[in-house]
A protein has these predicted regions:
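Zymogen propeptides
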Residues: 21-129
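Short, surface-exposed beta-edge/turn micro-motifs
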Residues: 91-92, 133-137, 172, 194-196, ...
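Bacterial N-terminal signal peptides
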Residues: 8-17
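Active-site-adjacent helix-turn-beta-strand microarchitecture at beta-sheet edges
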Residues: 105-180
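Conserved, well-ordered active-site substructure
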Residues: 106-126, 183-234, 241-268
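Active-site neighborhood of phospho(di)ester-bond hydrolases with catalytic His/Asp-centered motifs
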Residues: 95-97, 233-236
């Protein structure tokens, strides 16, 4: 009888101990779990950083756009130059390229930085991914409320004053629009490229994704819609322009880029 009394608890404790020792992937979060980054291998290999939108309502974290060097009209270009501009009481949790740019690394779409409009909303037709309509804008107000809005819808909101962006970056195409994959994406598409994008998701988090292998637009959009549960998601860029800084998972791309989006944390 003594054996029957003590065997189950001991085995349960052993199983719990073994379970606790098992690796949980490459997920690493800060102490408050406001953000985390990890590397995933399904449905394809990708790196993702999650940000709890509620964290932006406090004073410890801020989502920002960066473009030019301080007191200069020269673009920052790299994560290293951005890091050098941050004050000693702040650190860059993670960052990625924020959208498409011209030959001078200036944004080609609507851009607002700290309430100042850098580039007006671009509703013109054209070629390339940016003009694969509908495209959209990731934007947030001074209160840290983040949205991804289709460009024509945002145009109407700007006219009425409903939208008052403190930061904004326009890119395209939209990946997911109101829970629907972009209508021009082909499930059998054969154009495979490295891609990065961002989604505002139903669990209250933002998902910043950088594919670590070439994928189609449809595959990339499906990740946001089906796995990450993002009703709205926006393509930022791809190929050689796709860049990620996430030191918690040993990611630090050295590429040149235009506008950068990043999460800044105040040091305790």
């Amino acid at each position: 009888m003594l054996r029957s009394i003590f065997t189950v608890p001991v085995m349960s404790l052993l199983m719990l101990s073994l379970s606790a020792c098992q690796p949980s992937g490459s997920d690493k979060a800060d102490s408050s779990s406001a953000w985390s980054c990890e590397i995933k291998d399904s449905p394809f290999s990708y790196s993702v950083c999650h940000l709890d939108k509620a964290a932006l309502k406090g004073s410890d974290y801020s989502l920002q756009l960066f473009w030019q060097q301080p007191d200069s009209d020269q673009p920052l270009l790299t994560f290293d130059k951005l890091l050098a501009t941050l004050p000693s009481n702040q650190q860059l949790a993670f960052a990625m390229n924020a959208g498409m740019y011209n030959g001078h690394y200036a944004p080609i779409g609507y851009t607002v930085i700290k309430g100042k409009e850098i580039k007006s909303l671009n509703l013109k037709p054209g070629g390339g991914n940016f003009h694969l309509l509908p495209n959209g804008v990731i934007w947030w107000n001074k209160q840290g409320e983040v949205q991804i809005t289709e460009s024509n819808a945002l145009s109407a909101q700007l006219k009425t004053g409903e939208a008052q962006p403190w930061y904004a970056s326009q890119s395209g195409p939209m990946l997911v629009i109101n829970n629907e994959i972009h209508p021009k994406f082909n499930a059998d598409g054969t154009s495979l490229k490295f891609r990065n994008g961002v989604g505002v998701c139903s669990d209250g988090r933002m998902q910043f994704v950088n594919s670590d292998e070439p994928v189609s637009f449809y595959q990339f959009a499906s990740l946001f819609k089906d796995q990450l549960q993002c009703p709205n998601a926006l393509f930022l860029d791809g190929g050689i322009a796709s860049a990620l800084y996430a030191p918690s998972i040993d990611k630090h791309d050295k590429k040149d880029m235009g506008v950068i989006i990043g999460v800044v944390a105040d040091n305790p």
